[in-house]
Regions:
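Phosphate-binding site recognition
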Residues: 1-240
Length: 240
C-alpha cells in the first residue's frame, strides 16, 4: 500500500495511458520514496529498468565509465538482450537498449525506468549527448514509449533536463517533484504499520525525521518514540 502520493500516481497512470511518447523526470531529496513510487505506480508494466552505480569509491573517470557501462550491459542481459558484446560507449549502449526494446515490442506501452540517472553521467563519458540522441533520435518517434528517469541529484535533473539549454530543451513531457510526507500522511503511515503513536509523538517524529518514509520504516512496534529515535540516530547501524 502506498501512503499518500495520490496526485503523483494519477499523473503517472495518465501518462502511461496516453497515445504519445512520454518523457518523465521525477526528483526529490534522498530517501523520499521516488523509486518506491515508480515501482508501485507502474507495477508489472516496466519493460526495462536500470539503476546507475553510486560514484562513491570509484577512483578515476575511466573506471567510473567502465563500471557504469558494465552495469548497464548486465541489466540489458538480465532483461533479454542476446548476441551483443559489452558496449564501449554510451552511444553503443543505448543502441543495444533500442535493439532490446524493438525485439520485445508487441505494440503495447513500453516503460523504460532509469533510476539515479545523474550517477551515470560521469566526467568525459559522453553520456549526456548519447542520452539526448536516444530520446531525440529514437524514443520521440515511437508513440508507445514512456521514459521515466529519477535521481536524488536535483540540481542535475533541473539543469540537464528540466531547464536544459541543449539537446533536451523542452523535451520533458512531465516532471514530478516528490515531497516528504505531510504530518497527516505520517499519521496514516504509522496507523497502517500498526505502530501505536500519540499525536505528540507523531509530531515529534515529523520534526526529527522530516516526513521521510525511509527513516519511518525503521520504527519498531512496542518501542517508544524516544527508543526508536535513539536506535535510528545512534544505534550500532545509524540510518542518518
Amino acid at each position: 500500500m502506498i501512503i499518500g502520493r495520490k496526485e503523483e500516481i494519477a499523473e503517472l497512470d495518465k501518462l502511461y495511458h496516453s497515445d504519445r511518447p512520454e518523457f518523465v523526470a521525477i526528483y526529490g531529496r534522498r530517501r523520499v520514496g521516488k523509486t518506491f513510487l515508480i515501482k508501485q505506480a507502474l507495477k508489472d508494466r516496466i519493460t526495462f529498468q536500470h539503476t546507475g552505480v553510486s560514484p562513491v569509491d570509484q577512483d578515476n573517470d575511466r573506471n567510473r565509465l567502465k563500471t557504469q557501462l558494465e552495469s548497464f550491459y548486465y541489466a540489458l542481459l538480465n532483461q533479454g538482450l542476446e548476441g551483443y558484446k559489452m558496449p564501449k560507449s554510451w552511444l553503443e549502449a543505448f543502441f543495444l537498449l533500442e535493439q532490446l526494446l524493438q525485439d520485445q515490442d508487441n505494440g503495447e506501452r513500453q516503460v523504460i525506468f532509469i533510476d539515479e540517472l545523474p550517477w551515470m553521467d560521469t566526467p568525459r563519458s559522453g553520456f549526456l549527448p548519447a542520452f539526448e540522441n536516444f530520446w531525440n533520435g529514437w524514443c520521440s518517434g515511437r508513440d508507445n514509449i514512456m521514459l521515466v528517469v529519477c535521481g536524488s541529484a536535483t540540481s542535475w535533473i533541473l539543469s540537464n533536463l528540466s531547464r536544459s539549454k541543449g539537446g533536451l530543451y523542452g523535451r520533458l513531457t512531465a516532471e514530478i517533484k516528490l515531497s516528504p510526507f505531510t504530518l497527516k500522511e505520517c499519521e496514516e503511515y504509522f496507523e497502517h504499520a500498526n505502530i501505536q503513536m500519540s499525536q505528540y509523538d507523531i509530531l515529534q517524529s515529523y520534526m526529527v525525521f522530516g516526513g521521510i518514509p525511509y527513516y519511518m520504516g525503521y520504527f519498531q512496534k512496542g518501542l517508544s518514540f524516544e527508543q526508536n529515535a535513539d536506535k535510528i540516530l545512534f544505534g550500532n547501524r545509524p540510518r542518518l
